[in-house]
Curated annotation (Swiss-Prot):
Homodimer. ATP binds at residues 31-38, 148-151, 177, 185-188. Its EC number is 6.3.2.1. The active site is at residue 38. This is Pantothenate synthetase. Gene3D superfamilies: HUPs, Pantoate-beta-alanine ligase, C-terminal domain. GO terms for cellular component: cytosol. It comes from Staphylococcus carnosus (strain TM300). Catalyzes the condensation of pantoate with beta-alanine in an ATP-dependent reaction via a pantoyl-adenylate intermediate. Keywords: ATP-binding, Cytoplasm, Ligase, Nucleotide-binding, Pantothenate biosynthesis. One of its GO terms (biological process) is pantothenate biosynthetic process. The gene is panC. Coiled coil: none annotated.
Length: 286
């Protein structure tokens, strides 16, 4: 049976004991509102580690004023049952007061990797992400941590943080998990109206169009971006926030495509901003 732990000290003691006993710890950090994407990572952690921990913590540091922090769905009972169904041993569910008892005196700041894509739209977001992930890594002390490739920029930033701060942790990227119609699973999909939900699979279809152009030999980013943008504008009622082509994981904007590239898009519907991406041109990220 899955045990819920709310105390940082209790989680640290448990992690210390597991380490002392030579057991490997797998960790899936989440903000809750669990869906099949999260559960796929949890099942993988259970398969690959002796002990598996999932965190459920809606991190205020990564939300700017006016974003959906207060509205973000919270249901720890439902999330615990879902985590238990995936075989998770422990759900770490600290309070905001436990994680941030005082005003933050020291926080991490991401460099150039956060100046593009989502980071350009949400300037404080990734600073909040790496600060909380760094804290969670210190508390849970995992051997492996699992992140979804749907947030590929986040994955690249976390991998760089682990490298720069010498965390002895293997970062495992999990393929995007999709609905039957191709929409990437996301906790924010619940915000879509019925009409928007019918339109949302166009995000993946536009990426498939980009891949088709690439496979046919197109190497000019401008042509691919224009084709994807036109497809999204004609197949959804949302506002196309961004379509861009970057190298991966360096996240340098590409004008003429060479090597591994990351095609990223964001569409803003009435109450939800959805992202999707495709990595092509070289071996997939592990």
């Amino acid at each position: 049976m899955t045990e819920v732990i709310t105390s940082i000290q209790d989680m640290q003691r448990l992690a210390h004991d597991f380490k002392h006993d030579g057991k490997s710890i797998g960790f899936v950090p989440t903000m809750g509102a669990l869906h099949d994407g999260h559960l796929t990572m949890m099942r993988r952690s259970v398969k690959e580690n002796d002990v598996s921990v999932a965190s459920v913590f809606v991190n205020p540091l990564q939300f700017a004023p006016g974003e959906d922090y207060d509205a973000y769905p919270r249901d720890i009972e439902k999330d615990t049952k879902a985590a238990e169904s995936a075989g998770i041993d422990y759900v770490f569910h600290p309070s905001v007061e436990a994680m941030y008892p005082d005003e933050i005196g020291v926080a991490l700041k991401v460099g150039k990797l956060a100046e593009v894509l989502e980071g350009a739209q949400r300037p404080i977001h990734f600073n909040g992400v790496v600060t909380v992930v760094n804290k969670l890594f210190n508390i849970v002390q995992p051997d492996r941590a699992y992140f979804g490739k749907k947030d590929a920029q986040q994955l690249a930033i976390v991998e760089k943080m682990v490298q720069d701060f010498n965390h002895p942790i293997e970062i495992v990227g999990q393929d995007i998990v999709r609905e039957d119609d191709g929409l990437a699973k996301s906790s924010r999909n619940v915000y879509l109206t019925e009409q928007e939900r019918q339109e949302a699979p166009a995000l993946q279809k536009s990426l498939q169009l980009a891949e088709k152009l690439y496979r046919e030999g197109e190497r000019e980013s401008k042509i691919i971006v224009e084709a994807v943008t036109a497809y999204l504008e004609s197949h959804t009622s949302g506002h196309v926030d961004e379509v861009a082509v970057y190298s991966y994981p360096e996240l340098v904007e590409q004008h003429h495509i060479e090597g591994r590239i990351f095609i990223s898009l964001a569409v803003k519907f009435s109450k939800a901003r959805l992202i999707d991406n495709l990595i092509i041109g070289d071996e997939e990220i592990d």
